[in-house]
Regions:
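Bacterial N-terminal signal peptides
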Residues: 10-22
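Metal-dependent active-site segment of extracytoplasmic phospho-/sulfohydrolases and closely related
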Residues: 39-40, 58-59, 206-250, 257, ...
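Short, structured active-site-proximal loop/turn typified by the sulfatase FGly-forming signature C/S-X-P-X-R
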Residues: 49-83
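Short, solvent-exposed turn/loop segments enriched in Gly/Ser/Thr/Pro and often Arg
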Residues: 70-88, 130-137, 297
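Substrate-binding rim/cap in mid-to-C-terminal beta-strand-loop elements of soluble/periplasmic
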Residues: 84, 88, 248-291, 302-308
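His/Cys-centered metal/cofactor-coordination and adjacent catalytic loops
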Residues: 93-111
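Active-site His/acidic residue clusters
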Residues: 134-148, 171-212, 216
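Polar, surface-exposed loop/tail segments
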Residues: 290-321
Length: 322
């Protein structure tokens, strides 16, 4: 039987009243569960309490948009190169072996696989790294899938503003493969800490300059149409006290850890203990890559993800060491 349009509407109303059909609301596009891109920003020498004393609207915004803790721990010794090696390898210092803190080319490269290698092998991810200190080159192995940019702190123009601008410019000009994993080191706060003292006015001013630079970076990702598909992780290699660091003092060991992006809880305060070492596995989790095998101590910070209930830990984290 053919039902004409007016009769069709009346029939629908009758069926609705009888509870035999339901109105279907338009389905909104589901938010992505995983990130297409991950940006890890290591703010050299950033103490958590500096975020309360300095004006940091960009980092405050990431904290509100994502998950964070101000009680994360770096590794011992609390020095830049060993800490960066731990963040990138997912291993403590005594296992990755990079226990020095100066650029010494004859020592060669870290022997353990790093996050760039793991992401490239398991997810075909291209990478980009932007360094403010040459000594971190001990952790970065040259690869055709990796864009490397070093802007030395010995050059006056090499500040956070320039480096974050380089990140956006490099993405725009990349031709062979667009980076998906970015690691950015910003040393402004550390330089001010060594020169004028941690928590001094110049140090807090440097923290504010870094915050503005990160804001420029976020805007660049928005302009490129990448922001909503990108997870941003901001942390530090160490804190500092007086004009130094490297001890087991809480001022040196405590660091912030912030993550915001697809599939990450908003306004969430992380409850579990967090180590800088856990950054590597959390990056892989943010990409949605869980089937990989690497012998590391890094564990994803599972509670920050909206699908954390019943989630499976990376297979590599469950296998015993050989």
């Amino acid at each position: 039987m053919t039902v004409r349009a007016p009769a069709q509407r009346w029939l629908t109303l009758i069926l609705l009243a009888a509870g035999l059909v339901e109105l279907q609301a338009p389905q909104a596009a589901a938010a992505p569960a995983y990130a297409d891109n991950v940006v890890v920003i290591m703010v050299d020498g950033l103490r958590p309490d500096a975020l309360k004393q300095a004006k940091v609207p960009t980092l405050d915004g990431l904290i509100k948009r994502g998950a964070s803790t101000m009680k994360a721990q770096t590794v011992e010794p609390s020095l830049t190169l060993p800490a960066f090696a731990s963040m990138m390898s997912g291993l403590p210092v005594d296992q990755h072996g990079v226990d020095w803190n100066e650029y010494d080319p004859p020592r060669g490269f870290i022997k353990s696989p790093t996050l760039f290698e793991i992401a490239s092998f398991n997810g075909s991810k291209w990478g980009a790294v932007f360094l403010n200190k040459e000594k971190l080159l001990h952790v970065i192995k040259q690869d055709r899938r990796l864009l490397l940019n070093v802007c030395s702190i010995n050059e006056q123009s090499c500040n956070a503003k320039k480096i974050t601008g380089d990140v956006i410019a490099s993405y725009k000009t990349a031709t062979e493969g667009k980076p998906a994993l970015f690691v950015v080191q910003l040393a402004d706060a550390d330089t001010a800490g060594h020169d004028q003292g941690w928590m001094s006015k110049p140090y807090l001013k440097a923290v504010e300059e870094v915050d503005r630079a990160i804001g420029t970076l976020l805007k660049g990702f928005k302009d490129l149409g990448l922001y909503d598909r990108t997870t941003f992780i901001v942390t530090a290699d160490h804190g500092g006290h007086a004009k130094t660091h490297g001890t087991s003092m809480s001022e040196d060991m405590n660091i912030p850890w912030i993550a915001a992006g697809p599939g990450i809880k908003a306004g969430y305060e992380i409850k579990q203990p967090v180590s800088l070492i856990d950054t590597a596995a959390t990056v892989m989790r943010a990409f949605g890559i869980t089937d990989y095998y690497v012998e590391w101590k890094s564990r994803p910070i599972e509670e920050i993800f909206v699908d954390a209930v019943g989630a499976t830990a990376p297979s590599g984290a469950e296998r015993p060491s050989r």
